[in-house]
C-alpha cells in the first residue's frame, strides 16, 4: 500500500513557516533591556534610600524623646524643651523647602504627577537632599505627617537621576523611570508591592502611559524595592493588628453604611485641606521668615501635644493597632479623631515636607473602630468585631479622598495581612468612592496639582508682563 510522504519542498516550507513563527514570537516583546535594567537600579536605590529615610526619622524621634526623658521629673523644663526641640526640628524642614526646593513641600505626589505630564520640573539634585533632611526634621518633630509622600517623591527623583547619570534621552525612558521610582517609593514606605503598582495605574492613570514597556519597568522596580525593604526590615506586616475574623454575609450591609459615612467625610476633608492651605498662604504671603516661624510654631505645638495626648501626634502607625484593638471608648475615639483632623490639617496644609497617607489611615481607623463599637452595641446578635470595621475604615477615607479605591483596598490588606477581609473592604471603599463622586468631591492630589499649575501659570504671566517694562526703563 502506497503512503503519502512529504516532499523535500514541503518540508522546507514547514521549516520556513516554523522559523517565521518563532521569530515573530521572539520579536513580539519590544521591551528595551536597558530600561528594565535601569528600572532595577531605580528600585534598588529607592529601597535603600527609603529604608535609610525610615531609620533616620526613627533616630531623630528617639533622640528627641530621649532628651525629654532626661528631664521628665522636672515639669518646668519638660514642657518648654518639648516645644523647643520639635519647633527647631520643624523649622529645619520648612527652611530647607522654602529656601532651596519649594516643590519638595507637602506630599510631593502631585509634583510627580505633574512631572509625568512634563508640566513640573524634576530638580533631583535639590529635591533629594531637601526632602530627605527636611522630612527628618518634620517627621522627627512628631508632626502629623507620613513618610510615604517623601519616599514617592524621592523615588521619582531617583528615577530621573538615574536617567541623567546614564544619559538616556528618550521620552519613553524619562517617563517610565519616573513612574517606576514613584511606585517603588510607595512600596518601600509601606512594604506593599502590589499597592505600589496599583497606585501608579489607578491614582496616576491620567498621567501614566500604560504600555508593555512601562508596566514591566514598574514591576521590576517594585520587586527590587520590596526585596531591599524586606532584607532590612523583615517580612512581617508593618501594622500588627492580628488575624481578625471574617465578616459574615448578613453583616455586610453595615460596611456599606460605613462606606456611606466615609463618602461624606472624604469631600469635607479635602475641602478643609484646601481651605487651610489658603489660610496659611494668606498668613505668610510667601515670606520665608513668616513661613519658617509658622512651621516652628506648628511643630512645637505637636511636641506639646505629644506629651498631653500622644495618640494625637505623629504619623499614626503606632495608634492604629491600639485603636483597632478596641482599647478606647467610642467617645474617646471620636475625640482623638477630631483632634487628629485638626493636627493633620495644620501640618499637611502648611507645606511641611511629609505625606498624608499615614494620617488618613489613622483617621479612617479611628472612625471605623468607633462605628464598629457602636454597631456591636446596637446589634449584639451579630457578634461584631470592631477591628474589622477599623480595617475597612483605613482604606475607605483614602478611597473617598484620593479617589483610588483599589489602591486603598490592597494597601490596607498588605499592611495588616488580613486578606480575608477583602469583601467588606471592597464594599466599604467602593461605597465611599461612589458617594464622594456623587457629592462632587474631587481627588485630593489632582486638585492640589491643578492649584500648583494655576499658581505656576500666574507667576509666569506676571514675569512675562514685567520683562518688557524692565527693558523699556
Swiss-Prot record:
GO terms for cellular component: plasma membrane. It is found in: Cell inner membrane. A motif (Selectivity filter part_3) lies at residues 355-359. The record marks 203 as: Mediates proton transfer from the protein to the inner aqueous phase. It is a multi-pass membrane protein. The keyword Transmembrane helix applies. InterPro entries: Cl-channel_ClcA, Cl-channel_core, ClC. Pfam families: Voltage_CLC (PF00654). Residues 70-76, 233-252, 310-329, 377-386 are periplasmic. Keywords: Antiport, Cell inner membrane, Cell membrane, Chloride, Ion transport, Membrane, Transmembrane, Transmembrane helix, Transport. The keyword 4Fe-4S does not apply. It catalyses: 2 chloride(in) + H(+)(out) = 2 chloride(out) + H(+)(in). The record marks 148 as: Mediates proton transfer from the outer aqueous phase to the interior of the protein. A motif (Selectivity filter part_1) lies at residues 106-110. The chain crosses the membrane at residues 33-69, 77-100, 124-141, 148-166, 215-232, 253-281, 288-309, 330-349, 355-376, 422-438. SUPFAM superfamilies: Clc chloride channel (SSF81340). PANTHER family: CHLORIDE CHANNEL PROTEIN. This is H(+)/Cl(-) exchange transporter ClcA. The lineage of its organism: Bacteria, Pseudomonadati, Pseudomonadota, Gammaproteobacteria, Enterobacterales. The gene is clcA.
Amino acid at each position: 500500500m502506497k503512503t503519502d510522504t512529504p516532499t523535500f519542498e514541503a518540508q522546507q516550507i514547514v521549516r520556513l513557516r516554523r522559523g517565521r513563527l518563532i521569530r515573530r514570537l521572539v520579536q513580539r516583546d519590544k521591551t528595551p533591556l536597558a530600561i528594565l535594567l535601569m528600572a532595577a537600579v531605580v528600585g534598588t536605590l529607592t529601597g535603600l534610600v527609603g529604608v535609610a529615610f525610615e531609620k533616620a526619622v526613627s533616630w531623630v524621634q528617639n533622640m528627641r524623646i530621649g532628651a525629654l526623658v532626661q528631664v521628665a521629673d522636672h515639669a518646668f523644663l519638660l514642657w518648654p524643651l518639648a516645644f523647643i526641640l520639635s519647633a527647631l526640628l520643624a523649622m529645619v524642614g520648612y527652611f530647607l523647602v522654602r529656601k532651596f526646593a519649594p516643590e519638595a513641600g507637602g506630599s510631593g505626589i502631585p509634583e510627580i504627577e505633574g512631572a509625568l505630564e512634563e508640566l513640573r520640573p524634576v530638580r533631583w539634585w535639590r529635591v533629594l537632599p531637601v526632602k530627605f533632611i527636611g522630612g527628618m526634621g518634620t517627621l522627627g518633630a512628631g508632626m502629623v505627617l507620613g513618610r510615604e509622600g517623601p519616599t514617592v517623591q524621592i523615588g521619582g527623583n531617583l528615577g530621573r537621576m538615574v536617567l541623567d547619570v546614564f544619559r538616556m534621552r528618550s521620552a519613553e525612558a524619562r517617563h517610565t523611570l519616573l513612574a517606576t521610582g514613584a511606585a517603588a517609593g510607595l512600596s518601600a514606605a509601606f512594604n506593599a508591592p502590589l499597592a505600589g503598582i496599583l497606585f501608579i495605574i489607578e491614582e496616576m492613570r491620567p498621567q501614566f502611559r500604560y504600555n508593555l514597556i512601562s508596566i514591566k519597568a514598574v514591576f521590576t522596580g517594585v520587586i527590587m524595592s520590596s526585596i531591599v525593604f524586606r532584607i532590612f526590615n523583615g517580612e512581617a506586616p508593618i501594622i500588627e493588628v492580628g488575624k481578625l475574623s471574617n465578616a459574615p454575609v448578613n453583616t455586610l450591609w453595615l460596611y456599606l453604611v460605613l462606606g456611606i459615612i466615609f463618602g461624606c467625610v472624604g469631600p469635607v476633608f479635602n475641602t478643609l485641606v484646601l481651605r487651610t492651605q489658603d489660610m496659611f498662604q494668606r498668613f505668610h504671603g510667601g515670606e520665608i521668615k513668616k513661613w519658617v516661624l509658622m512651621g516652628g510654631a506648628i511643630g512645637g505645638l505637636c511636641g506639646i501635644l505629644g506629651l498631653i495626648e500622644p495618640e494625637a501626634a505623629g504619623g499614626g502607625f503606632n495608634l492604629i493597632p491600639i485603636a483597632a484593638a478596641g482599647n478606647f471608648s467610642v467617645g474617646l475615639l471620636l475625640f482623638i479623631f477630631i483632634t487628629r483632623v485638626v493636627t493633620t490639617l495644620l501640618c499637611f496644609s502648611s507645606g511641611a515636607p511629609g505625606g498624608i497617607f499615614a494620617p488618613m489611615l489613622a483617621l479612617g481607623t479611628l472612625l471605623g473602630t468607633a462605628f464598629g463599637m457602636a454597631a456591636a452595641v446596637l446589634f449584639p446578635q451579630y457578634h461584631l468585631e470592631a477591628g474589622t470595621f477599623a480595617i475597612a475604615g483605613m482604606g475607605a477615607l483614602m478611597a473617598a479622598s484620593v479617589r483610588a479605591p483599589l489602591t486603598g483596598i490592597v494597601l490596607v490588606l498588605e499592611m495588616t495581612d488580613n486578606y480575608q477581609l477583602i469583601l467588606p473592604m471592597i464594599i466599604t471603599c467602593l461605597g465611599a468612592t461612589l458617594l464622594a463622586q456623587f457629592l462632587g468631591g474631587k481627588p485630593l492630589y489632582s486638585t492640589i496639582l491643578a492649584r500648583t499649575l494655576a499658581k505656576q501659570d500666574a507667576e509666569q504671566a506676571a514675569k512675562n508682563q514685567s520683562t518688557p517694562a524692565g527693558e523699556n526703563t
